[in-house]
């Protein structure tokens, strides 16, 4: 967050309360050498305990709590944009409604265009990545079922054709049937 409360520093001077820690303001303390770049303030008497900002904003305390909270904020922001570590990703528990809609879509399309993925994600209140990964996993599941012989490999059209062929065979005699089966 942004510092909002003024505070006093040990040895005099003022600063801002940031994350519960008083930090030195760099406005007056920082100096600009002839090369034009800001350098850490020499007036920072407790320099070993703080990181002085090079852009004239604020010096930050190196307390573990503050570093930890800044790291958490950074990690959260990175993960919002899909740049965070995959180790911390949480397993998505899809609702029954979400699963039925995803399965319905998968029945018609094994692969989604980006536009369709965005549309489905918005409708089901998921993000694009969740929809994309669900479809990848579902295709792998289908492939595994086909390999094990538990699902037809032709997709929905193949199932309809198989059902049609099965009904044709039941209404007409099999070429392999015995002659006794015809004399009823």
Curated annotation (Swiss-Prot):
Instruction: Tell me the lineage of the source organism.
Output: Eukaryota, Metazoa, Chordata, Craniata, Vertebrata
| Chain's role | Sequence-specific transcription factor which is part of a developmental regulatory system that provides cells with specific positional identities on the anterior-posterior axis. Acts on the anterior body structures.
Give the main location.
Answer: nucleus
Q: Where are the transmembrane segments?
A: none
Point to the regions of Low complexity compositional bias: 166-184
**What PANTHER family does this protein map onto?**
HOMEOBOX PROTEIN HOX-B1, HOMEOBOX PROTEIN ROUGH-RELATED
Q: Identify the stretch(es) annotated as Disordered.
A: 140-184
Q: Does the keyword Transcription apply?
A: yes
Q: Sorted alphabetically, which keywords does the UniProt record give? A: Developmental protein, DNA-binding, Homeobox, Nucleus, Transcription, Transcription regulation
Protein name in the entry: Homeobox protein Hox-B1
